[in-house]
Amino acid sequence: MVPTEKLAQITERFEYIEARMAAGAAGEDIAALGREYAELKPVVAEIAAYSRARADLAEAEAMLDDPEMRALAEEEIPALKARIPEMEQALRLALLPKDAADARPAMIEIRPGTGGEEAALFAGDLLRMYQRYAEAQGWRFQIVSESLTELGGIKEVIAHVSGSGVFAKLKYESGVHRVQRVPVTESGGRIHTSAATVAVLPEAEAVDIDIPASDIRIDTMRASGAGGQHVNTTDSAVRITHIPTGLVVTSSEKSQHRNRDIAMQVLRARLYDLERQRADAERSAARKGQVGSGDRSERIRTYNFPQGRMTDHRINLTLYKLDQVMQGDLDEVIAALAADDQARLLAEVEG
């Protein structure tokens, strides 16, 4: 049973915000009110539906004492009793604490791991998988920095993804992705195992993370292209070191000004991610290492090409539709990961 007092408080808060926004909310932060309104609206809709169902059940049970209405009540009561637990579960999920970063755009960083050139080629496959997934979601996908190998693989790529609910879905992709297949570079037909690392960070604005100029060191260096050749003769590449944490971010596009912007954007995202991880650890050590924790060293998924199989090791989910997955069909696996995350959070909240 969900405490009715808590439901009443949420509804009252929603009605207050609605009234303040309708009145113009002079002197208040309209944007903050708008965000809270948008967050509470679906919760209040669940509360209203749940309250109506309970009222309908109480009314039907009262009708049992009326001989003329008894037959109708006996017909309605089983259906109402069956619906209420489902609605209560939906309401409990709606009441779960929200990740403040879920609505934010995201930065995706992909780097090859073990496996040499094959790992770099697989990193490129992952990039295209996310591009197709973003397109299917109606998101904007922009590559902000990319370094390629001579065979067209990826040494490193950073992309910016914006749209509705980007980080809420992509956050489950952080970790080590392993591939098992016969590489194009393999003449003997042997299956190799390679890996690539994906990091998904919520975008951070300057107002979220204050980086004093005294905390960073900016170095310029000569940019290199595929195979290590110099792509120009100017020192356009930028390396920014965050002195307090030791974080280092490098960008080597052709424009030094753009490289500074990219490096600062990535640095803000990484520092914001560190703050989030620290806060999560303080809130609950029990959630460390679970789905969505963002542990970059965790092997999360295996893509087995000979068997056409994708396995997500965090929830023991295996799908035999690898071709569709690599074409960006990630809905099923992401939905399963989100459901598992909700179940764990619900268990934690309810003890």
From Swiss-Prot:
Pfam families: PCRF, RF-1. One of its GO terms (cellular component) is cytoplasm. InterPro entries: PCRF, Pep_chain_release_fac_I, Pep_chain_release_fac_I_sf, Prokaryotic/Mito_RF, RF-1. Gene3D superfamilies: 3.30.160.20, 3.30.70.1660, 6.10.140.1950. It is found in: Cytoplasm. Keywords: Cytoplasm, Methylation, Protein biosynthesis. GO terms for molecular function: translation release factor activity, codon specific. Its main location: cytoplasm. The modification N5-methylglutamine is found at residue 229. Methylated by PrmC. Methylation increases the termination efficiency of RF1. Peptide chain release factor 1 directs the termination of translation in response to the peptide chain termination codons UAG and UAA. Belongs to the prokaryotic/mitochondrial release factor family. PANTHER family: LD18447P. This is Peptide chain release factor 1. It comes from Dinoroseobacter shibae (strain DSM 16493 / NCIMB 14021 / DFL 12).
